[in-house]
Amino acid sequence: MPLAESCSWDLERMRKSAAIAADEASASGIAWTFAPMVDISRDARWGRVMEGAGEDPYLGSLIAKARVEGFQGGNDWRSLADVNTVLACCKHFAAYGAAEAGRDYNTSELSQNTLMNYYMPPYLAAKEAGVATFMASFNEINGVPSTGNKWLMTDLLRKDWGFKGFVVTDYTGINEMVAHSIVRNDKEAGELAANAGIDMDMTGGIYSQYLVQSVKEGKVSEENIDRAVA
């Protein structure tokens, strides 16, 4: 249980536990894990508190680094050539644990100060540790779903932080932007996600169904596609 592990402050054992998990997973042919979850949580009503490190961004950042290095064998992508390592995925970007009233998938209303200084440090720590992938969160941040948030996925993550890996949605995250009422249909949801900087659609089928048409119509640039598959 990650929350229980965090109470120990034993970073080396947390790194080692991730390394053991990577060793066992890779032996079964698994190359990618959807971990670590690094979301800061301040509301005990949220049902996923136990998956993270709790409410302290400093401790959360240390643990994010330890787990990424455990899964990937170090802080350099070259270590992924080792057969005993797996790709790590930093999730859920961003502020998933800030959902109002602890309701999963809910909106998050956050000042820039609170967002950047309280919720963002563990994600940045994972990036600095060399995490290969990020997963977008389901929630809105100040009215904009993370899966369609260009400021979050492109301006902050890639341009400001210099992230060079790829971003995957959470399960049907693109489809669910229709329920957020920010787009009218699945096709528009796919365009919003692609233009925001989402590289992979997890199980939703939106990209495979609509993306070629959206490129032909000029709604999504070929440059965005090239970047996503590079």
Task: Label each residue range with its predicted role.
Residues 1-230:
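Glycoside hydrolase catalytic-domain context in secreted enzymes
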